[in-house]
Design a protein with these regions (language model features):
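Charged, gly/pro-rich active-site loop segments
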Residues: 1-5, 88-152
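A generic structural signal for nonpolar/aromatic side chains embedded in well-ordered alpha-helices
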Residues: 14, 69-70, 112, 139
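Short beta-strand segments
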Residues: 19-62, 68-70, 76-80, 89-91
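Short secondary-structure boundary segments
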Residues: 81-83, 141-142
Length: 152
């Protein structure tokens, strides 16, 4: 039966495999929305009163539209959905923080690569994407809307 997800269900949905691609909305300089696909990982170590599921972490090149947008305007929204019955989704609104720290960048690029491409390709993905010019982005949730089993 359709129901609103609790925080643990949200975290499990975001971490489930096979990994789903998120749809990230950022704000262009002229105020128009920009939506782009992102691979992400959930950092449960950041769970707390101000982040009940933890931060959503992804990387992007600083020169991309989303990279430029979020360094200027940190408000973001991310939607992750299940496109097969019984259909579920999580939408997260929040604020981004950006880092260019090389160790953090390599770590998260490797984690994300393993999540989407498999453990055997994680290091290669990390080495290719954990480089200067890339950003580590942490989306700290301020609002989460999530429903499970919508077609039941």
């Amino acid at each position: 039966m359709a129901h609103a997800m609790d925080d643990e269900e949200v975290a499990e949905f975001l971490e489930s495999l096979p990994a789903r691609t998120g749809k990230l909305a950022s704000v262009r300089a002229d105020g128009r929305p920009h939506v782009a696909p992102v691979w992400y990982a959930l950092d449960r170590s950041t769970r707390g009163p101000d982040s009940p599921v933890g931060d959503i972490v992804f990387n992007t090149a600083s020169a991309t539209v989303k990279g430029r947008n979020l360094t200027r305007e940190p408000r973001l929204a991310l939607c992750v959905d299940d496109d097969a019955p019984p259909f579920s989704f999580v939408t997260i609104e929040g604020t981004a923080t950006v880092s260019e720290d090389p160790d953090e960048l390599l770590h998260w690029a490797t984690v994300i690569g393993g999540r989407y491409m498999g453990a055997d390709q994680a290091d290669a993905y990390g080495a290719r994407n954990g480089v200067p010019g890339e950003l580590v982005v942490r989306l700290r949730p301020t609002r989460i809307t999530a429903s499970a089993r919508l077609a039941d």
